[in-house]
């Protein structure tokens, strides 16, 4: 059975909604929740997630909201934080990582933290039983792939398309996937460039799929009530 990771932007449109949505997703087939930390310049994300980031910040998102959502959700749904390094660095990594572990968060996904710099924090993550998810991209050399995944934890984040999230580009990922699996037994999840339409094709041979923009697209629809948004996201989770 393939694993499903769902990304949602924290506290968009508000904290209590994020908690209700996260728990509903957990009840409807989502194995892992990726709680996005709103950031003003989310360079790796597509227009939908960027818009949700900006709206959450406009609505007054504070880092404490992420902590409060996580405290409510992490005991019930496997939870990761996804955010840009500056968001975490400003909280003091030496204090934040132990706090995340105490809350029950199981790992961080930091797309703009290069592997070489992430090594600075490897002991901190290990001491607190927290995973720092490794990224590999189709543009990486075989040598770099070997280096990056040598210390991979929980799962390897395989970038489906060397661009921005949610692009839904169609391409053959099997050779790239095979090259990763040659060097590691760590599960490989496909993300970045996965849309609702391409999820089933792109997950072939992988151990899981990460979907964000398809859920955010629903959340951005102003004509839907909160209950309708949760219902549609839950239905999407069931068919992915």
Which residue stretches match the model-derived regions?
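Histidine/lysine/aspartate-rich catalytic loop segments that bind and position anionic ligands
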Residues: 130-167
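Conserved, mostly hydrophobic/aromatic
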Residues: 6, 25, 36, 100, ...
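Glycine-rich phosphate-binding active-site loops on the catalytic face of alpha/beta enzymes
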Residues: 32-42, 103-109, 113-117, 157-166, ...
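Hydrophobic faces of well-ordered beta-strands that scaffold small-molecule active sites
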Residues: 4-8, 33-35, 79-83, 108-110, ...
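N-terminal amphipathic alpha-helix/helix-capping segment at the start of soluble metabolic enzymes
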Residues: 1-9, 69-71
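Catalytic cores of alpha/beta
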Residues: 15-25, 140-151, 190, 194-209
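Active-site-adjacent beta->alpha loops and helix N-cap segments on the catalytic face
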Residues: 15, 39-51, 57-69, 88-94, ...
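Glycine-rich beta-to-alpha transition loops that act as phosphate-gripper elements at the mouths
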Residues: 9-14, 82-90, 114, 136-139, ...
């Amino acid at each position: 059975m393939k694993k499903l990771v769902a990304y949602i932007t924290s506290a968009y449109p508000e904290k209590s909604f994020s908690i209700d949505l996260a728990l509903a997703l957990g009840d409807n087939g989502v194995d892992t929740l990726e709680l996005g930390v709103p950031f003003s310049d989310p360079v790796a994300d597509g227009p939908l997630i960027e818009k949700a980031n900006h709206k959450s910040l406009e609505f007054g998102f504070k880092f404490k909201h992420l902590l409060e959502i996580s405290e409510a959700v992490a005991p019930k749904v496997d939870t990761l934080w996804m955010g840009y390094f500056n968001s975490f660095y400003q909280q003091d990594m030496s204090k934040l990582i132990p706090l995340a572990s105490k809350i029950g968060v199981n790992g961080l996904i930091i797309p703009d933290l290069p592997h070489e710099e992430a090594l600075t924090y490897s002991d901190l993550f290990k001491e607190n039983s927290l995973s720092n998810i490794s990224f590999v991209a189709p543009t990486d050399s075989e040598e770099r792939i070997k280096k990056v995944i040598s210390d991979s934890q929980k799962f390897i984040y395989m970038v489906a398309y060397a661009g921005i999230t949610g692009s839904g580009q169609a391409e053959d990922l099997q050779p790239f996937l095979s090259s990763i699996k040659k060097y590691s037994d760590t599960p490989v999840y496909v993300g970045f460039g996965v849309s609702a339409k391409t999820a089933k094709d792109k997950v072939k041979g992988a151990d899981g799929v990460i979907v964000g923009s398809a859920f955010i697209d629903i959340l951005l629809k102003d004509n839907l009530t909160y209950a309708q948004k949760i219902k549609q996201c839950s239905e999407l989770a069931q068919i992915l």
